[in-house]
């Protein structure tokens, strides 16, 4: 998730091209041990890395299961710029291996950000293999994913945000002897803003322009509706 975190900054949506909870080590999950190191043992300022291990979990629904796996991320931050690369690989359970090709689930991702002078801008690209779950609970054999976000913090409290999220599924529903199909599974623009009254309280609103084609949505069983959100947050 360390690479996806750079662009998972949208007002309401975002971060869902490939990262999701309880999907191997791509988000909040269970049965993991994590080691993080800052400034590379004190030798290189801004160079950080993390190593993660996840134990086998086969006692849940097939989309929430995982075999033994490991993950690694490395990031470097200097003068407002940040760069990160992440990779993870896990065994698939016997139930999962029956859906698509391969006994392993993998993801790699690269991201970059600029966070200075009241500006936040970030981009992320990543690919998954036998890992990403479609809306109809099938695993995608491969996905190609891109996310981008830009925001500006005004001194009077307004923080407008513009984000884009895209994910293309490749070779979907392929089986031995049967070729799969390609289809977009996520494709939208989010326009939104926060307004901060003080450090404890803010209001926000966002609109999601869903660009997903109905033909692609019919293949992946994804929604095509636009969405709107408004809310208020108070932090004690």
Predicted features by range, described:
Residues 1-21, 55-66, 93-100, 177-180, ...:
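Surface-exposed loop and membrane-interface regions of Gram-negative outer-membrane beta-barrel proteins
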Residues 1-56, 66-68, 75-82:
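Outer membrane beta-barrel
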Residues 33, 195-197, 223-236:
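Outer-membrane beta-barrel "beta-signal"
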Residues 41-44, 140, 211:
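Short, aromatic- and cysteine-enriched interfacial helices/patches
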Residues 44-50, 80-82, 118-120, 159, ...:
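Outer-membrane beta-barrel architecture
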Residues 65, 70-191, 195:
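Detector for outer-membrane/organellar transmembrane beta-barrel domains
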Residues 142, 184-186, 208-209, 213-225:
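Mature soluble domains of exported/periplasmic/lumenal proteins and thiol-rich metal-chelating peptides
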Residues 190-208, 212:
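C-terminal closing repeat unit and adjoining cap/tail of repeat-based domains
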């Amino acid at each position: 998730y360390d690479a996806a975190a750079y662009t998972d900054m949208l007002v309401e949506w975002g971060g869902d091209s490939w990262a999701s909870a309880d999907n191997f080590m791509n988000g909040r999950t269970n049965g993991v041990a994590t080691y993080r190191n800052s400034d590379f043992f004190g030798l290189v300022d801004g160079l950080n890395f993390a190593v993660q291990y996840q134990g086998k979990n086969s006692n849940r629904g097939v989309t929430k299961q995982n075999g033994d796996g490991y993950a690694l991320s490395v990031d470097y931050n200097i003068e407002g710029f940040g760069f990160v690369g992440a990779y993870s690989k896990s065994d698939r359970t016997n139930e999962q291996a029956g859906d698509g090709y391969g006994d392993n689930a993998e993801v790699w991702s690269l991201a970059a950000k600029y966070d200075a002078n009241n500006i936040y801008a970030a981009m992320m690209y990543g690919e998954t293999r036998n890992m990403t779950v479609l809306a109809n609970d099938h695993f995608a054999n491969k996905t190609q994913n891109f996310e981008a976000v830009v925001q500006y913090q005004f001194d009077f409290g307004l923080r407008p945000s513009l984000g884009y999220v895209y994910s293309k599924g490749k070779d979907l529903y392929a089986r031995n002897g049967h070729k799969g199909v390609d289809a977009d599974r996520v494709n939208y623009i989010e326009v939104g803003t926060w307004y901060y009254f003080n450090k404890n309280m803010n209001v926000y609103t966002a609109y999601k322009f869903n660009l997903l084609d109905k033909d692609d949505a019919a293949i992946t069983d994804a929604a095509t509706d636009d969405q709107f959100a408004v809310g208020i947050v108070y932090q004690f």
